[in-house]
């Protein structure tokens, strides 16, 4: 009987301070000559100054320093675009995805569908997959914008297992597909020994056994180091397996801290270059109409054809200083949310605007909001062609009273389009269009338009009249 130990992380999302603690544990307990050390994706989150300023390269340097064998490509690795991804794949470290391609289905330079590693005489095939959301227009919108194509992974995994038969003894799927997809693959694919999962942030105290395949996943945010131990007989059949998630209580790893410091210095130097200087600071409030949010709403409306702009204040975290840099904009708008054009009814718009005057919405918080970076939901900002009488609950668009039965084209975020926070806005897929730009990208492109600073002084929310 042989023991094969797979140590793993997933969905670290740039929580590198906690990752440093995990690496201290790895240095003590992982036998790099015998064990396997894998990450199941979403390690590099663009909210990080280091990741943003090094185009993800800083994250790869951390994985290399920690002794990782490979990483599956998660959505946060490719959402920043092809240029960023190819910089990461050019760092002499295995980034795996068998189902991520260019839009024309050609391979992406440096992306590997699988690798085979030999430890203690055992040949282990490691296949990677990225998240697959389906083929509908709304499902493919983000990858289309990135110039990429995701294919359904199940048949691809089966094909690789059959194609490589005889070249490996044990097979691992390193999956950023989420627990639901992992279970589907385990049910369907023959000859797969185990799945190390990610994407769904699932905390699995024990490994799950489906159709001869063992599945394990370790939550998120570097809270745990996962450990999956396989018992293998002389014919390389997995006889049993055990999984655990280890809470690490160690000191930070000095080597990781040094790499972080070096890469962060590179990032800050790149991001701190002054782009331009505004005539004034743009103040921010989570509760009240403010210059920063008025400017943002106006530039949204002016840039994307729509009847109005509507966005929650929680999309920003602070005001915008006169000296505009990429670093400042990342701090102001760390969210990876995209500009999104939707069609909402007048009633949906009115209900959301009126709800946004209530504290239970303004100060709402929730850990389940995917991609949401603000600490609170915030009130709602609108473009200057919208006039709201808060006392009389009258809303006008271009001077005409809002018609609750009419459909309006609105530029907003994919966060609000999903009905996150302001639940009355959810469910709109009719004529929905996603823009490639993040909100900080739009700010960078348009903040030097002084007419927007002027229009931002137009009051939209009126009381006492």
Q: Can you say where each PLM-predicted feature lies in the sequence?
A:
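A short C-terminal boundary segment appended to hydrolase-like catalytic domains
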Residues: 233-324, 447-465
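Feature captures C-terminal
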Residues: 15-18, 320-465
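Acidic, metal/ion-coordinating pockets
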Residues: 1-247, 289-299, 309
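Glycine- and acidic
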Residues: 8-10, 280-283, 337-338, 424-425
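Structural signal for hydrophobic packing residues in well-ordered secondary-structure cores
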Residues: 26-30, 89, 161-168, 179, ...
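Charge-rich, low-complexity terminal tails
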Residues: 194, 218, 225-226, 299-305, ...
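A short, polar/proline- and glycine-enriched secondary-structure boundary/capping micro-motif
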Residues: 135-139, 227, 250-258, 320-321, ...
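Structural motif
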Residues: 175, 313, 412-414
């Amino acid at each position: 009987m042989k023991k094969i130990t797979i140590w793993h992380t997933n969905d670290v999302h740039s929580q590198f301070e906690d990752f440093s603690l995990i690496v201290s544990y790895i240095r003590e307990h992982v036998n790099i000559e015998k064990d396997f050390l894998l990450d199941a994706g979403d390690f590099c989150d663009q909210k990080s100054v280091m990741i943003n300023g090094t185009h993800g390269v800083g994250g790869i340097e951390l994985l290399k320093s920690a002794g990782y064998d490979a990483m599956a490509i998660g959505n946060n690795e490719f959402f920043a675009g092809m240029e960023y991804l190819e910089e990461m794949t050019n760092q002499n470290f295995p980034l795996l995805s068998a189902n991520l391609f260019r839009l024309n289905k050609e391979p992406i330079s440096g992306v590997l569908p699988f690798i085979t590693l030999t430890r203690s005489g055992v040949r282990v095939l490691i296949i990677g997959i990225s998240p697959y959301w389906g083929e509908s227009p709304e499902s493919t919108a983000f990858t289309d914008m990135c110039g990429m194509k995701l294919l359904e992974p199940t048949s691809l995994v089966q094909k690789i297992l059959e194609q490589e038969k005889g070249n490996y003894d044990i097979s691992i799927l390193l999956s950023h597909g989420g627990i639901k997809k992992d279970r589907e693959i385990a049910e369907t694919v023959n000859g797969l020994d185990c799945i190390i999962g990610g994407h769904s942030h699932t905390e699995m105290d024990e490994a799950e056994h489906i159709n001869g395949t063992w599945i394990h996943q370790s939550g998120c945010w570097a809270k745990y180091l996962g450990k999956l131990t396989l018992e293998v007989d002389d014919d390389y059949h997995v006889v049993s397996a055990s999984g655990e998630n280890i809470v690490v209580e160690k000191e930070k790893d000095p080597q990781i801290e040094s790499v972080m410091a070096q890469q962060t210095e590179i990032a800050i130097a790149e991001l701190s270059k002054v782009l331009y200087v505004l005539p004034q600071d743009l103040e921010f409030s989570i509760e009240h109409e403010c210059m920063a949010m008025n400017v943002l709403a106006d530039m949204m409306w002016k840039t994307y054809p729509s009847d109005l702009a509507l966005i929650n204040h929680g999309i920003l975290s602070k005001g915008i200083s006169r000296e505009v840099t990429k670093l400042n904009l990342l701090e102001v708008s760390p969210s990876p949310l995209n500009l999104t054009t939707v069609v909402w009814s007048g009633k949906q718009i009115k209900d959301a605007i009126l709800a946004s005057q209530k504290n239970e919405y303004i100060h709402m918080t929730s850990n389940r909001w995917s991609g949401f970076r603000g600490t609170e939901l915030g009130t709602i900002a609108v473009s200057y062609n919208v006039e709201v009488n808060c006392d009389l609950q009258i809303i006008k668009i271009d001077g005409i009273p809002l018609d609750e039965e009419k459909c309006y084209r609105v530029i907003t975020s994919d966060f609000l389009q999903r009905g996150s926070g302001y639940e009355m806005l959810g469910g709109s897929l009719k004529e929905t269009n996603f823009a490639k730009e993040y909100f900080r990208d739009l700010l960078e492109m348009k903040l030097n338009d002084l007419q927007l600073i002027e229009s931002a002084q137009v009051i939209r929310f009126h009381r006492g009249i």
